[in-house]
Design a protein with these regions (language model features):
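A hydrophobic transmembrane-helix motif
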Residues: 77-79, 83, 111, 177-220, ...
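Transmembrane helix-loop-helix hairpins at lipid-water interfaces of multipass membrane proteins
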Residues: 1-40, 61-115, 122, 196-200, ...
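Alpha-helical segments in transporter systems
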Residues: 2-11, 59-80, 84, 101, ...
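Juxtamembrane loop-to-helix connectors within ABC transporter transmembrane domains
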Residues: 54, 119, 123-124, 141-187, ...
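Cytosolic ends of transmembrane helices, especially the final helix of ABC transmembrane type-1 domains
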Residues: 233, 256, 280, 289, ...
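ABC-type nucleotide-binding domain
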Residues: 363, 370-371, 377-628
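Loop segments that connect adjacent transmembrane helices in multi-pass transporters
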Residues: 151-156, 229-277, 373-375
Length: 628
């Protein structure tokens, strides 16, 4: 074996290292990621934002860094110790020296395993805390978004952001960053150790590195595409499940189970193919790297064995059996982190892309925000006034046009009109679920835009047609997790709204289980529970939006009795299609195409014989016909 100029050797090493650094830099800086969308944030910006969540746990990361140094030291030192043991065994057998070498190796191994274990435990705990903080902030931000903003984002997409994407980020804190750092130092440390041990054998090992760089670049391309398909397929199936499981009753009513099953099968197969493609990419890359590893081992055994048997001196360095054993271990420890780096850079890109997806949701500015000088509203009498209010969901398509009216405190006002006339929109604007474009809305003479949103809504109680009950118990749904309300007060409210009549018949009373969305209760029972939930929080203004629609006659009588009692609690605003349910209202406002066309009490509107008279006569005749 001929001797090589050390400068040539150093040049080759620098060239290989440069190739690795360029490949790694390209992997991190690539704007196209495994998530399948154009990146808008720089990696540095994402890391800075994530670092804010990691900063409270900086001391823990410093401890992990120290423990990581011990693990790196083991990877670099252990082959030297084993090589020395081999030389002791192959040469003059000295039991004392051999025992000392084995003891040192065992001690280093145990210490390394202990530090690795502690490192893993600390990282898992800290990583989960960081992700828990991030997930809570994300959920809190989603809660702050306006209704119209939430309507623009599929629920399945939000679920994916809160679950899958945050889990991808957790990998970065619990494993990726530390492993990337460790593997980089291990590669450099082993490279230096091999150079010090034998230049030419090191050069032989480095001859295989350019092939790894090429395989890594190719792997990164196909792996990114596979990950993109997998992420998109996962999001698609989550969105589909969220929508169709919520509407499964409609599917069953119209007998569309087979069609929906076929749609789901296609999406499920798409997800399966994406998983298979990702597995295939990894199953090809790993054997290729392993092939290079085996090839380098064979070259080591051949060249090293030839040098050892022929007692050849390489640049003044004699190859001993200990050197061959040491290089054998170094090659294994050298190729393993290189293989891991390629995959870890790819997963890092996926984690950064997931972080950008999460931050893209958190960067959505709520359209309903408190003014800088917004005030707290401690008490509300319930006086409401609309002054020339204009509102549109879509620019240019006005839903309300110059609406003006006044509601005195403790008055009951009903809004009637055809579908799309703007009745429910008025109630939504009062609670600031949407922002109106023109005019003013006043509560007790104060512009609602000058009141803190949380403070404003605290004085409103909303009872909607589609009552939403949370999984839990009847008690938890009435008090809404507000501790300190005694059962006696809860039952008093239930009696007030006639909900006690069915609660007392239940086996567990207030502790009766409420399934998802309250599906184990009838529509009327859910409505009575919503009345109790509203009354117990003592609102100053009560809003009923089609609260008596689709209710059986017996339950409607109970609800009507409850409404009569609730009129004494505070101001009441009602939207109803059944005109018979609002005859008691102090004022009835009739809307058409976003404008008020009639208003007055029931008798006044009948005497006018206008549109309200026509609607009432039509409904009355229909009821008479049904009774006959």
């Amino acid at each position: 074996m001929m001797h090589l100029n050390p400068l040539v050797l150093v040049g080759a090493v620098i060239g290989v290292i440069t190739a690795l650094l360029v490949a790694a830099y390209a992997a991190v800086k690539d704007k196209k990621t495994a998530m399948g969308f154009e990146r808008n944030m720089e990696d540095g910006e994402i890391m800075r934002r994530l670092a804010r969540y990691a900063r409270p746990y900086l001391s823990k990361f410093l401890i992990v860094g120290v423990l990581m140094l011990f693990s790196i030291a083991y990877d670099i030192i252990s082959p030297l110790i084993v090589g020395r043991i081999e030389e002791l065994v192959a040469g003059e057998f000295e039991l004392r020296a051999l025992f000392l070498g084995v003891s040192v190796y065992a001690g280093v191994l145990v210490f390394s395993m202990g530090s690795t274990y502690l490192q893993a435990v600390i990282l898992q705990r800290v990583g989960q805390r960081i992700i828990s903080d991030l997930r809570e902030d994300l959920f809190s931000h989603i809660e702050s978004l306006a209704h119209e903003q939430l309507n623009e984002i599929p629920v399945g997409k939000l679920v994916t952001r809160v679950t899958n994407d945050t889990n991808a980020i957790s990998m970065m804190f619990t494993n990726l960053l530390v492993q990337l750092t460790k593997n980089s130092f291990v590669i450099l440390g082993i490279l230096v150790a091999m150079l010090c041990l034998n230049y030419e054998l090191t050069l032989m090992v480095l001859c295989f590195v350019p092939f790894i760089v090429i395989f890594t670049v190719i792997f990164r391309k196909f792996s990114r595409r596979a990950n993109r398909k997998l992420k998109n397929a996962t999001t698609d199936i989550n969105t589909y499940l969220s929508e169709n499981l919520s509407g499964i009753k409609v599917t069953q009513i119209f007998g569309r189970e087979d069609e929906k099953m076929e749609d789901f099968r296609k999406k499920s197969q798409k997800l399966a193919r994406a998983n298979q493609e990702q597995i295939f990419v990894f199953s090809v890359f790993r054997p290729l790297v392993y092939m290079l590893y085996v090839s380098s081992i064979l070259c080591l055994f051949y060249l090293g064995g030839m040098g050892h048997l022929n007692n050849v001196s390489f640049l003044g360095q004699t190859i001993s059996s200990g050197t061959i054993v040491t290089f054998y271990m170094y090659i294994s420890k050298f190729f393993t982190p290189i293989q891991n780096l390629a995959e870890q850079f790819n997963w890092l890109q996926s984690a950064l892309a997931s972080a950008e997806k999460v931050f893209s949701i958190m960067d959505i500015q709520p359209r309903m925000q408190d003014a800088p000088d917004a005030i707290e509203l401690n008490e509300v009498k319930g006086e409401i006034e609309f002054r020339d209010v204009w509102f549109s969901y879509v620019p240019g398509e006005w839903v309300l046009q110059g609406v003006s009216f006044h509601v005195d405190a403790r008055q009951t006002v009903a809004f009637v009109g055809s579908t799309g006339s703007g009745k429910s929109t008025i109630l939504s604007l009062i609670c600031r679920n949407y922002e109106f474009q023109k005019g003013q809305i006043l509560i007790d003479g104060i512009d609602i835009r000058k009141i803190r949103i949380s403070s404003l809504r605290r004085h409103f109680g909303q009872m909607l047609q589609d009552v939403f009950l949370f999984s839990g118990t009847i008690r938890s749904n009435i008090v809404l997790r507000e501790e300190g309300i005694p059962d006696s007060e809860i039952m008093e409210v239930c009696r007030y709204v006639n909900a006690d009549k069915f609660i007392n018949k239940l086996d567990h009373g207030l502790d009766e289980e409420v399934r998802e969305r309250g599906n184990n209760f009838s529509a009327g029972q859910r409505q009575l529970l919503s009345f109790a939930r509203t009354i117990i929080h003592k609102p100053s203004v009560m809003i009923l939006d089609e609260a008596t629609a689709n209710i059986d006659t017996e339950t409607e009588l109970l609800i009507q009795d409850s409404l009569e009692k609730m009129r004494t609690v505070g101001t009441m605003l009602i939207v109803a299609h059944r005109l018979s349910t609002i005859q008691h209202a102090d004022n009835i406002i009739l809307l058409s195409h976003g404008e008020i066309i009639e208003q007055g009490n029931h008798q006044e509107l009948l005497h006018q014989k206008g549109r309200y008279y026509q609607l009432y006569t039509l409904q009355y005749n229909k009821m008479q016909l049904q009774e006959s």
